[in-house]
């Protein structure tokens, strides 16, 4: 036992003798502390390092998915600091966080192995105090904003809340000819998402690592999600800081595929949304086997020197027969006018290509896919007002072009854009109707409130409305009166924003809102009640509630 203790002391002595500048930084890499923090440790391939000394004092040099090392925020083990200090302290001298300053917003001091270190705060109060931040998001309170700033390693500030009460595209479009707009301060004007540079198409060998960066810009900062296009399985929405098999979405919205397999080939779509609009950009990945010796035989053309090719091959039926090992290749779809992946059993078909670029160069006519390209601003600052066709909204929209490194989905006028791309013609909207009489609706609803709409967030086919509560008329499941709730967030899970029901996009008066509660969340369905309130209608509802009309109706139904 004495020899074991002596061995421990001998092992600890060299580390204690090292100066602060020679030792590793305090803490551990996120994935060493908790496997669920793996993505955070892999969050970037850009801040390369060789040791902890290349990073700031609150960071560690950790492994990333690119096979290199990157600086990331160090982590400490919750509740372990006292035990570590009790075992490792010397001379009984008290070490504390007093006077130790954490410069990163949202970081707090804790003891780690007897030394004060900074860590991101992970506990915030439950009292709501909605805080609008400079990243365009609204946080439950300021503590949550500070914690997010620490996790991202950035600075966030509280800003004046901006409420978006109208449809993203309801403002009148600029008239032709469009005058060149003057650049404006991004903090004072919203702008729909645009790409800084055009999407890149990539090819990798089996087992390789590739990454796609959706360098989207916009105000407020767009939220980035990824989807892999597939006709054979349901599409999965991939969000930041998540891992899907061998695919990782980093904290900056970068998609990384490591140990690439043939089934990873395909088109990965980046979807960027903010309150001003939505954008989609497609990135193609082709995974080829080392057995395909001829793949890079013609580096100048980038095409393999294989079988003879005929233009008729592009319209040939896809051969999916079973002739051996399953493979994933590309084919040209004449109906969609673009290239896509398909799985086959190794049979030699005519409409079959190893890579997206081979398929595109062989079959896709010049200008055929222009209308599916995203809006690209480019790195220059010679601002021009241009128009592009948005394949998600199916209409031409204005964007700000920097003057260089764009693409062909950029037109000088709206008329030119409409003539080149198939613009969607909106159908006339029918008036929204709720089911039954107002008293029946009141009694069948889980909640009924009178509130002022303060914020409306619109997604592609869903949304969220925030109300400032003025009266709680009925509440069966949420305890709004018990907790003295002042704000209520209501989910809109099924909305056609071209003809929304209930239509609250243009209403700025106090509303009478009735809906249901599912899993603790307030929800408005297409047939739910949401209309401006009148004193007369409100008086009748109060009278009905005082007389317990809902209880009477329930007994009659039973």
Swiss-Prot record:
Keywords: Disulfide bond, Glycoprotein, Immunoglobulin domain, Metalloenzyme inhibitor, Metalloprotease inhibitor, Protease inhibitor, Repeat, Secreted, Serine protease inhibitor, Signal. It comes from the Eukaryota. The keyword Signal applies. One of its GO terms (molecular function) is receptor antagonist activity. CDD domains: KAZAL_FS (cd00104), Kunitz_WFIKKN_1-like (cd22605), Kunitz_WFIKKN_2-like (cd22606), NTR_WFIKKN (cd03575). Residues 22-75 form the WAP domain. This is WAP, Kazal, immunoglobulin, Kunitz and NTR domain-containing protein. The gene is wfikkn.
